[in-house]
Amino acid sequence: EQTADLKVNHIFKYTSIKEIFNEITGKSAEVLKGMVEKRQETQVILCYSGCGGVGKTTVAMGISAALTKNYKRVLYMNASHLQVFQQMLINHSPITTMDVYSRLANPGGNIYDDIKHVIRKEVFNYLPPFKASLLSLGLNYSVYKEIICSAKKSGDYDFIVVDTDVTFDEAKTELIGVADRVIVVTKQSMASVVATNILVSNINGVSKEKFV
């Protein structure tokens, strides 16, 4: 089966990060490669999937690394209710400054400026993990949208790569709306294809050209 209404790029599980980036930019020149060559403002790339375990975080970090190595200013941000992405980085430690969480609980239009001092860099810049789930911290999922929009407005980055979880709700549709491109990651299994088709069938009113 094929995923409905999407341009499908086949990427094997053990494909290198460089090959993944070249595959995406090569087959979707008008989508990502064009964005790299002709940037007018900060571009938001959202990595999404219909189910877990498909390698979405690997793809998101791979794109972040590849763009950085191509001399682009990149911010990687994990937008999950419970974050576990840090296991793929050298520094696993979460944000511990209570002032940051206080500001995230009541984000203003310049929330990025309020928290950018905690941003770290390994291969690429990234927002460190929160010390607990959004629920435990009393944070609304919409805080991610606020950070993205504020960081975009700052002009500090060429690309903001957002790695989101599989939850589909109103807040997630708002993230999709903010994104310039949405990469839907799947794998060659019946369960993954079915989940992707269900996801796509529930996304209405969004231009197909936004999706990779």
Model-predicted segments: where are they?
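Phosphate-binding loop that captures ATP/GTP phosphates
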Residues: 70-126
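Conserved catalytic-core segment of NTP-binding enzymes
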Residues: 154-155, 159, 164-212
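Cytosolic-facing regulatory segments adjacent to core modules
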Residues: 107-119, 126-165
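Structural motif
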Residues: 1-2, 14, 48-50, 79, ...
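Hydrophobic/aromatic beta-strand patches that form the interior of the parallel beta-sheet core
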Residues: 11, 45, 75-77, 125-127, ...
